[in-house]
Amino acid sequence: ASRGRVGGGALEESLPALHSLRVLSWDRGDCVAVPPQAVRAVLAAARRRGGTVVVDLPRRLDEGVGEVLAQLDLALLVVPAELRAVAAAGRIAAAVGMAVRDLRVAVRGPYAPGLDDREVARLLGLPLAGEVPVEPGLLRPRGGGRPPGASGRGPLARFCTGFWERALVESGGAR
C-alpha cells in the first residue's frame, strides 16, 4: 500500500464547490471500502486548510469510517422518528459511541404515534441536538443548483443555524 500526504490546497481545488462549500462525498454502495490511511490523509489535508470539516458518513461501519469517527470532535446521528429507524439507530449509536466522545441525536419528523424528539433521545440514551422538521423543498426537484437551506430560511436552515450557534458556544469560539 502506498502512503503519502494530500495537500490541503490541492484537495480543495479538486473538489466541486457549491456556494463556497466544498463537497467530498462518501460512496453509498456496499462494496467500496476506503483504506484508513487514505481517510487519515484526506482528513488531515482538510483540517490543515482550517475551519470546520463536516463528514456525512455511510450507514455501514468499516475501518475507513472508524478512522473518521476516531477524529471527530462531535457526531450527530440523524434519526427518522419511526420505531424501526430508532431500533436501527440504537445499534449504530452503540458502535459509534465507543469511538466518539460527543455523540448526539437529531430527530427528523414526521413522528410516528407515541414518539417525539425527546422520547427518541431517551430511547437511544443520547443528548438531543434538536429536531429536524420536514423540509418541503427537499420533496420536490430543485432547480438552479442551490443546496437545501441556502436561503437561510426554512426548517433545515433554522436547525443548522441553531445547532451551529450552540456548538460554537460549547467549543469556546469560532471554528
Predicted regions and their residues:
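P-loop/Walker-type NTP enzyme "switch/lid" segment
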Residues: 1-51, 138-144, 148-150
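Conserved catalytic-core segment of NTP-binding enzymes
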Residues: 38-141
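NTP-binding/hydrolysis catalytic cores, primarily Walker-type P-loop NTPases
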Residues: 144-175
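Intrinsic-disorder/low-complexity, polar/charged segments
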Residues: 7-9, 68, 82, 154
